[in-house]
Amino acid sequence: MSDESAREVDKQLRLRVCVLSELQKTERDYVGTLEFLVSAFLHRMNQCAAAKVDKNVTEETVKMLFSNIEEILIVHKEFLKVVEECLYPEPSAQQEVGACFLHFKDKFRIYDEYCSNHEKAQKLLLELNKIRTIRTFLLNCMLLGGRKNTDVPLEGYLVTPIQRICKYPLLLKELLKRTPRRHSDYTAVMEALQAMKAVCSNINEAKRQMEKLEVLEEWQAHIEGWEGSNITDTCTEMLMCGVLMKISSGNIQERVFFLFDNLLVYCKRKHRRLKNSKASTDGYRYVFRGRINTEVMEVENVDDGTADFHSSGHIVVNGWKIHNTAKNKWFVCMAKSPEEKHEWFEAILKERERRKGLKLGMEQDTWVMISEQGEKLYKMMCKQGNLIKDRKRKLTTFPKCFLGSEFVSWLLEIGEIHRPEEGVHLGQALLENGIIHHVTDKHQFKPEQMLYRFRYDDGTFYPRSEMQDVISKGVRLYCRLHSLFTPVVRDKDYHLRTYKSVVMANKLIDWLIAQGDCRTREEAMIFAVGLCDNGFMHHVLEKSEFKDEPLLFRFFADEEMEGSNMKHRLMKHDLKVVENVIAKSLLIKSNEGSYGFGLEDKNKVPIIKLVEKGSNAEMAGMEVGKKIFAINGDLVFLRPFPEVDCFLKSCLNSRKPLRVLVSTKPRETVKIPDSADGLGFQIRGFGPSVVHAVGRGTVAAAAGLHPGQCIIKVNGINVSKETHASVIAHVTACRKYKRPMKQDSIQWVYDSLESAQEDIQKSHSKPPGDGAGDAFECKVEDVIDKFNTMAIIDGKKEHVSLTVDNVHLEYGVVYEYDSTAGTKCNVVEKMVEPKGFFSLTAKILEALAKSDEHFVQNCTSLNSLNEVIATDLQSKFTSMCSERIEHVCHRISSYGRFSRVLKNRAWPTFKQAKPKISPLHSSDFCPTNCHVNVMEVSYPKTSTSLGSAFGVQLDSRKHNSHDKENKSVEPGKLSPMVYIQHTITTMAAPSGLSLGHKDGHGLQYLLKEEDLETQDIYHKLLGKLQTALKEVEMSVCQIDDLLSSITYSPKLERKTTECVTPMDSDNEKGERNSKRVCFNVAGDEQEDSGHDTVSNRDSYSDCNSNRNSIASFTSICSSQCSSYFHSDEMDSGDELPISVRISHDKQDKIHTCLEQLFSQIDSIINLLKGQAVIRAFEQTKYLTPGRGLQEFQQEMEAKLSCPRRLRLHLKQDPWNLPSSIQALAQSIRKHAEEVKCRILLALLEYSDSETQLRRDMVFCQSLVATVCAFSEQLMAALNQMFDNSKENEMETCEASRRWLDQIANAGVLFHFQSLLSPNLKDEQAMLEDTLVALFDLEKVSFFFKPSEEDPLVANVPLTYQVEGSRQALKVYFYMDSYHFEQLPQRLKNGGGFKIHPVLFSQALESMEGYCYRDNISVEEFQAQINTASLEKVKQYNQKLRAFYLDKSNSPPNTTSKAAYIDKLMKPLNALDELYRLITSFIRSKRIAACVNTPCSASGVGLLSVSSELCDRLGACHIIMCSSGVHRCTLSVTLEQTITLARSHGLPPRYIMQAMDVMRKQGARVQNTAKNLGVRDRTPQSAPRLYKLCEPPPPVGEE
């Protein structure tokens, strides 16, 4: 034998030893796995089934899951024993194993049963995993067995036997390959290979698995120079392969890439130069070049045209980056086409989601299970008494700890575990999950004499959502650090190099301690390490963990935005724009099992194919050919069409109204064909004219004309500035007949509810035949023309062409990003103009005008003061009153005029910011630039939304969140999705600047706080007095009616009433149980309970009862009557009643009436003695020098001592009781009227015309914005899309219902955020105006009513009505029955709730050194506002706590009640840290001595923290600046980005990048376009967080 042959044989024999070693090792592992399955799962489940602990775990269930696994274990124990005997003491080249397989080939047939049952077992396990108790039980089995459950789930263990039986042919094939033909084992191995193939072939499942593995093995055989473990060890299938260009180390090379589950391999194609070469005979096709485990692989998109460090300056097209995080190596791949790039990304996403989805869910389940088990064990150990106690160790006492050995022994004792090693596994799991820890944190769990402590006992236990808590704190910290006027994060020169946006580790720890975030340096370091672990920051050179040393660390988010000479800078765009949207929202109700439209798939996008004539879809504005973006929050344009169809069917089955986002254009041309039935629309107004109404099913509706559209051109001629008559002339120019005869049959759809109501009233009030009289009136708002003219085509034109501008457009952007949980998140950001904006303002003005009218009517009683006013002052009094009342009347007429104008205003649909102040106009009562910023987030529903902060970043645009086109949708089933809507309203701060003021101040400066309160007190007192006097009048009337029936004859009663006396039996009964008195009550009075007067005296109902004063009334009357009847003084001519008997119920009736009257009079007396009356007399004493408070009170005391006087009347002269009561009522009325007049006089003095007008103006602005903001959040909750905190592990439907219950009981919190700079005069005045406006808002209440079923206005889910006065304004929300039924019962029954506005104000620049007034600094002014608001937030929080702790609102079961309350209280318990931060911010502004210390460096951090605080309490958010444009845009974008990072898994590293994209490309760009003349007043010194992210300057210009 030649040397070369000998060397080859030696090599083969060495490899044979390797194969034998692998066979032995893997067989041992396999037997261990089987033993684990049997001991950890099978035995425990059998015990559970026998004990019947859970109805879902039965003997049949266990048998189905594990089949004959115990028999397989027995066989393989024998097989392993035989193999080890053959390979004893260790594998060598000459040993033989082929005979082992041949001996066991028949016994391996046992796998047939197991493999045939496997599919059923997997389905059963899938169902069992949906049951929480079973899932927890299985996790516990895994834990006690000592396995890391998130590495391999139970599903993986159950498939192991099939994988093993399929592995034998591959091992034997490799062994045969390495066994020389002359070897004694060669024949046996060959026969064993054939035998094992036969075994696998007879098992279907095993055959499929084996075929897959053979394909992979064959593929690997074609790779030359393969490195690492075999492909079949870690992978089961190839997902994608193709040729890509690879750029690394400056070289561009063509490489063949193969993507498997768990592995990416890239090779060089092998070129065959000679046909008969060795390579050809070996069959090598590729040369191995590298492999990356997908677990440590990140993929990042590269925009076309990019040339950066990783591409070595080469321009990248259709490319992406791959980062091997294990080796920290990068390379760039380029595909040949965008389609190929998309396919690769789709495959990568699919592989990642498959691998990570289950693992993340199991991590979350494990955390929940271990937390609950730890809590249970802790309580049991505490009850035990001698396990947890103070223990001494080396002269040190460790409180509340236990020994590891005692813990394991105790677990065995109570039956929690069956073997000591299970106790060790459980203890280690408790330690790893933060439930227990070693007292000095030096050891893992050991069953020895080591001390451990539950973290509950030393305050180091973190709540269940620990990951989310770190994310929330990290986002909060990042925002605070970047909100400072003196930055902590800044550029730093270090070792001859400048590092951008860095912070020293030890300085960050100093700052955290100074701010109070951490108490010790150790605690601060643990927090900072957590931030590094969760992807917030890292060492600038990736060379160190976080330590309390002068090391430089940078936030990833800063790195993303810094230019990019950074070596490890990641991708530029993670939050990617998928689509820009110009659309309108339609509301479509189902009707008779149909929505009235059909869709078709055109270019993979749902397009409206047909719209049924006269249907709800046509009424809403559906047009054929339009693209649909979203339905009920679901982005259907990203779904495959079969899924869209399935989604619509599910909506129809649930009878849900559809909220459809359909594409449109700002300006469209509508061609309306002539029709004998008319054109079918109405127009109104001019400059431009507006489509007032469209008939359902008419040609106009079919052509796509909608109410509210503005007519710009008619038949190509511009009529935007023409008169109404001119527009009509243009429309009717080609028509021969003026009007059709069939107008009454058309069902009109109007542009607003007011227009509809007005039109209906006109049509009802119009006499017959008067059809053409009102078409051309001079007032714009009254001009309506119904010209459904009959069309006879003249051959010239077959249609009327209208170019119209659409209204209520929604400008939006659809984004996508890959969340930390590994799911694709879609975000729709829209900026919406509120609907019903101007009409709501009009209704508020009408309510204010009615309130003024009522005030003027009351003022007519002022003349009654003439008798107490001095003669020489009467003329002054009269002129003052008439002058003030004239001002109020002028205001009433102005409000009426403004209301009419606003009701008919149609264009533009919002109020723009004015660059200059203009004279008073109706629009001054509307909020400026009021927009609702809507952000809708949707993503697949998984068991958890958390995950690593390092995610895959994809750029597969709109179809990468779904499977490929050929993916089939199971009929009737869709993967569940999460839909959440967040809303923030923006506006210019309420302002009355159009009225001007000589000092330039606002209302809070002009109106003293005590004056504001006094006016309120006066108005409330006035209302109470009026109500109380009415009640007195009603009580007196009742008593008069009762007493007037005395001495009436029963005969007369029978004549005058139908049923006057009771039946005979009742008479007899009454006679037996009655006393003889002087009163006879008519029968119809007996039906009256005496309580029919609704009393509203809650403010003065604390007076003492007067029942004692009339307790003996019956006996008094009886005795007095008796003496009267038998008196000699009785005139013989006096006629006595025939029946003078009265029953007990009639006596009780009189008792009740008198008691009620006495209580009412006492209440009025208490009111007349109150502080408000004293203040009113003090204010008006200059007009009545002869009659002051003392005289009034003396006179009142003399005349109104009612209980004593009336008791005297009853004893002495009961027959004169009616006159006494009348006299008493007149006296009380006289005194009350005098007080009323004085109050009215005082109010007239307060009623400065200009000040009240300004107050109404800012109140209207704030109330309109408040109603619009609440409406959007209310609809989100009713549509089950509201969720203010995803970290509470609550379904959106439950979170929505909880919020509705919350507002129904505690009211709704409104968070107003002011970005105004009070150092500027005009913005200071706006802030002062806003404070008064919010003071008035506290008097507003919200109520709800169902609307009419058949709406006259399309796409308006809510309409409003306003009633009441300035002191108690009620806003009624009318909604359709579907949404109304979802309201809490209290609201459906007519109950309402108050609104709780709070204002947090912080300028975006330092206010240090600016003075406000009276030696008060601007900083102190802001601090006062914020302190008061924080106190109100705390009060609201207390209301919520009280509501949640109310036993009546929780489940009846004690256990579930505790869990329910804990679930509700969790978000509230997390607020303490936010309270502390805001308090420290406010305090730091106030302490002048600390200006230069770290504790004062809060910057504008108050804004984001106060917003988070209110958001956690379910508040509605309104952000204000001077114009509602620039600063509002910055703040809204920041808040939305924070929400995405905190609640929806946006990787923290992309916070700044996401803000930059949303600011520069988002929906609010349109707001700037709509306000081109408005100056940007954002301070230049604003912190970085509130500045637009600018690109870095070129190199050399820094």
UniProtKB/Swiss-Prot annotation:
Residues 15-206 form the DH domain. Transmembrane segments: none annotated. Keywords: Guanine-nucleotide releasing factor, Repeat. One of its GO terms (molecular function) is guanyl-nucleotide exchange factor activity. Residues 1573-1598 are annotated as: Disordered. It holds the Pfam family PDZ. GO terms for biological process: adult locomotory behavior; dendrite morphogenesis; G protein-coupled receptor signaling pathway; phosphatidylinositol 3-kinase/protein kinase B signal transduction. Residues 237-353 form the PH domain. One of its GO terms (cellular component) is plasma membrane. It comes from the Eukaryota. Residues 382-456, 483-558 form the DEP domain. Signal peptide: none annotated. Residues 584-663, 669-746 form the PDZ domain. PH domain confers substrate specificity and recognition. Able to discriminate between RAC1, RHOA, and CDC42. DH domain alone was unable to confer substrate specificity and recognition. Interacts with RAC1. Functions as a RAC1 guanine nucleotide exchange factor (GEF), activating Rac proteins by exchanging bound GDP for free GTP. Its activity is synergistically activated by phosphatidylinositol 3,4,5-trisphosphate and the beta gamma subunits of heterotrimeric G protein. Mediates the activation of RAC1 in a PI3K-dependent manner. May be an important mediator of Rac signaling, acting directly downstream of both G protein-coupled receptors and phosphoinositide 3-kinase. This is Phosphatidylinositol 3,4,5-trisphosphate-dependent Rac exchanger 2 protein. It comes from Mus musculus.
